[in-house]
Amino acid sequence: MAELTISSDEIRSAIANYTSSYSAEASREEVGVVISAADGIAQVSGLPSVMANELLEFPGGVIGVAQNLEADRVGVVVLGNYELLKEGDQVRRTGDVLSIPVGEAFLGRVINPLGQPIDGLGEIASEEDRVLELQAPTVLERQPVEEPLATGIKAIDAMTPIGRGQRQLIIGDRKTGKTAVCVDTILNQKANWETGDKTKQVRCIYVAIGQKGSTIAALRKTLEEQGALEYTTIVAAPASDAAGFKWLAPFAGAALAQHWMYQGNHVLVIYDDLTKQAEAYRAISLLLRRPPGREAYPGDVFYLHSRLLERAAKLSDELGAGSITALPIIETKANDVSAFIPTNVISITDGQVFLESDLFNRGVRPAINVGVSVSRVGGAAQTKGMKKVAGSLRLDLAAFRDLEAFATFASDLDAASKSQLERGQRLVQLLIQSENAPQAVEYQIISLWLAGEGAFDNVPVEDVRRFESELHEYLGSNAAQVYEQIAGGAQLSDESKETLLKATEDFKSAFQTTDGTPVINEPEVEALDAGQVKKDQLTVSRKVSKK
C-alpha cells in the first residue's frame, strides 16, 4: 500500500497561486428594456450612460442606433426587422459608435450600409473600422481644386468641368439621365486605372439610396461588362430596406472614401440620390417626435447634407494629397430647383449640372441645360488644351438657344443669323453622346476645335455624329501623333492644326452623307467656247441603222 505524503509547501504554493489570480472587480453592464417598437423605431428605458450614435444590441441579433437621448428613455433607430422586437425585451449597450469595416478588399463588391457583403461572394477581409460620422478636413488641411477629373462627357468637361476634390451636383427631374451621367464618369476612369499609376487612378464608390433592387443589379452588371467593377464599390440601400439604412448609406460611402483618401488615393463618390436620404431622415425624425419644419423636414436637414458633402476635399501635400470628389444627385419635381432640398444642396456644392426633361425628350442627351449649369471651379479644373478650345462654347450655345427661340416666330433671318443657327444645330449634335460611351479628352478637344474652325458646317445635321465617329477613326491612323500630344497635356500647336485641317479635308472628300450629297461641293466646270475646241480632237460616233 502506497504511503500518502502531504507537502505543506505545495499546498501553500497552490493556494497562493489561486488567490493571486483572483480579481475582486465586478463587471458592470447597462441593460435597458424595450418600451415600444413600431415603424422602425424602438423606445428603450434604462440606459442612462448611452452615447449618441451608439450601437445597441437587441435579442435575435437585431441592432439599432441611439438617437433621441431623453431623461427617462432613448429613441433608437432599428437597423433590421423591428417586427422581431417586443415590449420587455432586454437591450444591451455595445460601447461602439456606429462604424464600418474598410479596406482594399471592398473594391468590386456590393455592401450594405453596415459594411456587410450582400453580393453572395463571401466575407470581405477588412483592414480596420472607420467611424461613419467622421469630422471633415479643416481649411488648413485642404488645398485648392486644380486637377481635372474627366467625365468623358463633352458637355461637362468643356463647359462645367469637375476637379478632384470638388462637389458637383447633378440635378433634374426623374428619367432625365442623371444616373447615366455618373455611370459614364465611372466608366471613363478605366484608362487611368489600367495605368497602375496611383496619381492617376480613381477609386469609385456608388451609393444607391432607395432604388429598386433590379436597378442596382443592372448597374452592377453594366460595370462588370465594361470592366469598371474592379475599381468600384457599390453601397446599396434599396427601397425595400428600412429608413435607417437609407439614412446611413451615404455616410458609409463617405467613410470608405475617407479611408482611401487619407492613404493618398483619389476617390469618386456618387450619392444616388440625396432626395431619398432626406425623405428617409424626415420619416425617422417624425417618428422620433422631433418638431417638423419646412415641408415637414426636421430643422437639421441642412446639416445632414452639409456635414456629408464637406468631407469631399483635396488634401494638402503634407497629408498625402489624396482627394474625394462628390457627385450628389438630387431629383426635382417639374424642374423646380427652388424647392427646399434642391436649394440646400445647391448652396453646399461647388456647382451644378442641370438636366432638363424637355431637352431629354427632344433627343438631346445628356440633356444638360447650359444656361443654368455652372462650375464654381471653372477653368482651374481643365487642361490647357480644353480651356483653349472650350472658351467660347458656352456663349455660342447660349446665343444659339436665344436665336432658336426667336427663329420660331421670325419668318426671315439675315445671313449671319442663319449661319449662327446652322452652326448651333451642329454643335448640339456634336455634344450628344450615347450612354456608356465616354470620350477621351484628346478626342473631345479635337472635335470641339474642328467645330470652331467650321469643319462641320457643311455636314448635314443628321450626319454630324456619324461624321465625327468616322473622322476620329481616320485621324487615328493619319494623325495619331496629334492625339498623343494632346493626351500628354499640351495644347494644339500650329503644325498640329494644319495636320488636322488637311486630314479632315481629305476625309470629307470620301465621306458619304445619308442623302448621297457630297460634303465638299466641287466647283462647276465652265463650258468651252467654240473657238477653244480643237476639231481634230473630236471623235463623232454615229449609230448605223441595220437594214
UniProtKB/Swiss-Prot annotation:
Q: Which InterPro entries match?
A: ATP_synth_asu-like_sf (IPR023366), ATP_synth_asu_C (IPR000793), ATP_synth_asu_C_sf (IPR038376), ATP_synth_F1_a_nt-bd_dom (IPR033732), ATP_synth_F1_asu (IPR005294), ATPase_a/bsu_AS (IPR020003), ATPase_F1/V1/A1_a/bsu_N (IPR004100), ATPase_F1/V1/A1_a/bsu_N_sf (IPR036121)
The protein's GO terms of the molecular function aspect are:
ADP binding; ATP binding; proton-transporting ATP synthase activity, rotational mechanism
What do the Gene Ontology cellular component annotations say?
plasma membrane; proton-transporting ATP synthase complex
Pfam families listed in its UniProt record: ATP-synt_ab, ATP-synt_ab_C, ATP-synt_ab_N
Q: Which UniProt keywords apply?
A: ATP synthesis, ATP-binding, Cell membrane, CF(1), Hydrogen ion transport, Ion transport, Membrane, Nucleotide-binding, Translocase, Transport
Described by its record, this protein's role is as follows: Produces ATP from ADP in the presence of a proton gradient across the membrane. The alpha chain is a regulatory subunit.
Task: Supply the PANTHER family for this chain.
Answer: ATP SYNTHASE SUBUNIT ALPHA, MITOCHONDRIAL
- NCBIfam families annotated for this entry? atpA, PRK13343.1
* Family, similarity comment: Belongs to the ATPase alpha/beta chains family.
Name of this protein: ATP synthase subunit alpha
Primary gene name: atpA
